Each structure stands twice: as C-alpha cells, then as structure tokens.
Amino acid sequence: MSGGRGSSSGNPADQSEAAEPNQSSSSSSSSSSSRGRRTADRQQVDIQPASEEDVDLAEVLAYLLRRGQVRLVHGSGATGLQLVQSYSDSDEDSDGAWEGRLGDRYNPPVDTQPDTQEVDQSEIRTQILLATGCSTLKAQHSFTHMLTEVRPQTSQTQSTNAIYLSNDIDPCSFRSFLPNYVSHKDTYQQKAFCGVYSEDGNMFLSACQDQNIRLYDTTKGRFHLRQTVKARDVGWSVLDVCFTPDAQNVLYSSWSDYIHLCSIDGDSETHTALDLNPDERRFCVFSLAASTDGNEILGGANDGCLYVFDLEQNKRTLKIDAHEDDVNAVAFADSSSQLLFSGSDDALCKVWDRRTLREDRPQPVGQLAGHRDGITFIHSKGDARYLISNSKDQSIKLWDVRKFSPKEGLAASRLAVTQQNWDYRWQQVPQRALKRHKLTGDTSVMTYRGHGVLHTLVRCRFSPEFSTGQRFIYSGCSTGKIIIYDVLTGGVVSRLSGHDACVRDVSWHPYEDNIVSSSWDGAVRMWEHRQTHPLEEERERERDCQREKDL
C-alpha cells in the first residue's frame, strides 16, 4: 500500500506507512511488463485528497486488520480501544520472519563467512592496500608505536583528527580510529530524511520532514546551525538534497514537478524552480546529483526516467526512459561527469554515457544484475570503475563497471523481483527474501550483509579516500544503527548505536574522522573517535555482545 502526501502523525496507523508515498516496493505482482506493473500499482494505491478519495479508510483498516499488520487492543482512550501495529504474520514463514520493528532491536542477518573470492582477485583490493600502506607492511608494532607514527598535518584544510598510516603500520589499526561516540547532535520535531557534507567538509546540509533545510557550520570541529531555509512546494518531505560544486547553492527535491535551486551565499535566499515537465500526474525525484562543472542536474524519478536539467539553458534537456520501475538512485561515476549510474526498484543498476544519451534510443552502456529486490541507493567510488548499491534484499553489493551482467543475469534478477510479495515500508522481511546464494549471472564483486533496509530508501557510501583510503563501506540501518563494513573482508567492523528509529542517511567528513547520521527519530548526530583504554574497549565489546544476546 501507499499513502498520500503529508507528514506522518502519532497515529500508529499512520506509522505503518513509513516511507515516501508511492515509493512502491519492487515486489509487484508478476506480469509480462514491469512498466505495466508500476502503472497498475499506481492506479490501485494512489490515494487522493478527501474530496476525491476512491479508497475508503474503513477498507484500508479492514485490510490491515485482515493481513495482521495492525490490531486492536484495550487502551485508556475514550473508546477503550487502541490501534497498534502488529508484527506477527499469518503466513507459513512467520516464525522465521525478520521483524522490522525498532523496539525489537533485532539483529539483521550477517554473513559469518563472506565470499571474498572475487574481491581477492580484484583491482580494488590492490588500490585499497596501496592506499592504506599495506603493500609494504613490515612487522606489526605496538599501539604506542603506531601513535608515534601518525603524520603531522600539512594544510589548514586537513583535520587534526584525520587518520594517517605510514607504510609500516598495520592497516587494521584504522579500526582503532573509527568514530565511536556522539560529540554533537541536533533534534527536530519530525523525521530527518537526508544529510550530506560539502565537498570541503566545511558545511553540513540536513533536510527534515518539517520542510526545513538546515545548514551547519562544521569548520574546526564545530557543528553550529548557520542557516535555516524553508523549502517550497514540498509534498510529504524533502527527499534529497545536494550542494552545487561551488557550495554556493543547494538543490532539493520532493513530490513535485520541480527541482528547487536555492542560494545559500549571503543573507538573502533566492529560490529557483527547475521545471522537469513530467508526464506523470504524481511525480517525484528521489535522487539528485550535480555535474562537476555545475551546469547539469541529474535526477531519478518515480516514472522510471532519468532527467537532465541544464542550468545555463534553464530547461530540461533530456528525459531518458531508463528503468521498468521507480529510479531511486542516481550518481556520476567520476569528476568528468560523463558516466552516469542509476538504480531502480527493478533491482538493476545501469551505466550510461552522457555523450551518447538520446531520448529516442535510451541504451545504457551496460547493466549490473544480482540483487533480488529494489535498489535504494548507489554510491560511486569516484574512479569510474567501482560503485556500491544498497537494496531491499538486505544487502549491499560492490560492482566493477567493466564486468557487466549477461542476459541470463538480467533475467534471473527480474524473476527474483517478481517473486517478492512483501512491502518493505511496513511489513516484516520474510525468511524467503533473505536467500544468500548468488543469482545466475550475478557479476558483483562482493556482497555485504548485516544492516536492515526497511521503511525508507536507506543509504550507503564509501568511506573517504583522504582519511581511510576508502577501506570501508558504511550504511544507515532500519534498526537505528550505523553499520561499517570492511570492503575487502565483508565483515562488520563497527556498529554505532544511539538512534531510536531508522537511520536513513549517513555522511562521513571528507577529511576528519567523524560521521553524521540522519534518523527518523528526528535526531542528527555527529560521531567522532574517542580514545579509550584497551581494557575499557574490551569490556565495552563484551557488554555489546551480551546486549546482542539478550535481544
């Protein structure tokens, strides 16, 4: 099901609709055309304002009760009854179902022995080992010796907290400097949807469901609110934000026909609406990216299309029929802005060449298949070779764009998507959705499991090159945690707990060792590293293990 535009309320029934409206799961009923599935789904679930409702609230409630998604219990209200969300399922997989409720503090499934065969033979392994000083690794040293080998800073733009390793330091010592405590935080009255650092790390941009976009000064270790911009033409929430390359403007999108450009330089605000002129009656851009020269804006939308808006010409220059379902994620492959990546609810990542894009012949350079469910986010390593994708199949995959998927891989992924019959926004993850064996034709380099993707389009990213050599992948999680993986081993190296609801977005400072998380509990938290005594760290690990067992 999908709800209409608007903010969530405290009503438990509203809480079951915990995602962007019309952001359908890739699990539509099987048919000959996924494009047809998306159209049919919209016709079935598009709930209009009260004056033209074609779905009665009583019918919706009856459906939820019948499906076991909500239940009535005795309460203290005027009616003596209270509506609460149910997390039991009547189907045969209920005993093995993974409950998506935050209160359960469940543990997402983790690969105890990740398959590293492909990544062990990949070029990214060599890149990371060189970047982290492992290629000339000598004898391991004590922790005290490692501290003495930390290199001094040479530029004012480089943080005193940045992590450096000389060639003879074990790269595993990176883990000793990972963020581990909250140094700053801000709290909103509604859900925080997304947040990102500027390219130089001097500003942090946050978007909330309260329609406010907040700009923070993050220079010299600060986290001070500098400016609040009231977003315009917002439906449901601001869903994505990004800086223009010169950091003088911000872009934001929502359920609207427009992408908005807002100046943040100086005291005045100038809002410019960029009309994408879509054909859909209900339209949304889920993901935004700006080209390196700042001239073009790339957007991925709920109509399955990629949009390119040229700021110099002040018009939409391209509309590419890209996917068979909602496009949830877009990204530029590198600073040339010539290669584009897109990810969709059809479970496919596609690679496009900007120089050959044509509306009348929308052919990707190649396609990457291996996910079993819709893709929620993609992030490029920045070298035009590697990217990662987050998915509703509860995994992240690492891809090499030089290894496209064969036809049988595309067919296997499409079939897997059509077999999904659950809604990630408000249902449990059925056990059958957590299959771990690779699909036929899966060309991914590595798969990472240990985080939850429920309720909304959870995001993941590579850690910065400057401070970590891009050794890690970090992700938000529907359990309210931040999960950090080792790119090369697939193992979870850190879990940061502190939020009371889904962490939708995460952003690592490009030069400092801190991460900012944006959560649906309304909190934005900055996580930094705090040095602790080795014995204290061991005790904390033991306490964490015990807490995990108790849950």
Pin down the residues of each PLM region.
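Acidic, glycine-rich loop-and-beta core segments that form the ion-binding/anion-interacting portion
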Residues: 348-375, 380
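Residue-level recognition of beta-strand termini and adjacent short loop/turns
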Residues: 336, 382-383
